[in-house]
Amino acid sequence: MNHQKTLVIILSETRCHELTFDNFKKNVIDELSADLCVCIGVKNDYDYNNPYYTLAKHRFLYNEEDDKNFAKSVEYSYKNTEVASDQKHYLYFLMLKDRVFTETSNPDSFTNFLISTYIHTFFLWFLHRNMKKFRILEKYDRFIISRSDYLYKLPFPKMKHLDPKYIWIPNGEDYFGICDRTAVLSRQNFEPYVNILESFYKKSNKYYKNIESKKNWNMEQILKMHLEENNVFPLVQRYPYISYCIRSKNGTTRWEAGKFSEKLGYFIKYPKEEQQATHHENDFLKSCVSIDEFYAEAIKI
């Protein structure tokens, strides 16, 4: 297949750039000859010299300063979704707050719901809205939705290894659902992947019925349920888990603080994730083949 024009999307935040940006640019943007989009929240103190922001060809910015607890975003997203009713179906979505899993000691279920689940689904909705508004989907063949706090142990697989008819997810960190930290999509499966919030609004009774029977839902389980409802879960395929999330010594986080590494000088947010990435790096180093040959063997359908 000829070169597939690729857009990499950094979702929600551009944190940890001082540790990750050079690694990201080399192993993702340069490796894939890709363009960058940032779809993020900004406050008054946001640093517009952030290298993720300055490199981005497309910038979709949500004003968090005016909506620090994201309460306004619920009605904003609902009003900008074509729902054939005057009823506030988003209230069913907010009832999820008592069904989501949290590792924090915060007794405020709504706050835990925000940081574990809602913010991610909202920014997927915000991304989808802007991609349609500015007709970005028609300009690219492939779309990689990811995050800025990743360090890559290996270059990202070239798109020729990832058949566009499938949804490609790293092979790990599923937590009884499906990993939500990176997704490689194409035009035909972009919408059924990202329209989680829209589906909760349009199919509120069905989605709430799916989740009301148990507690401790997490984002990974919600994503899997959503893909099943959209009849695209059978399209999910896996590629090697080659990156891991970090946090700088004084960096902020909405969720997992991580374990500090004295050797590396930063927090490893999910130690098992780092171990998986290192495992794949070691497999490549022992293989004595090119990175393309390594992925051709490692990625099977």
Feature map (PLM): residue ranges:
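ER/Golgi luminal nucleotide-sugar-dependent glycosyltransferases, focusing on the catalytic module
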Residues: 1-301
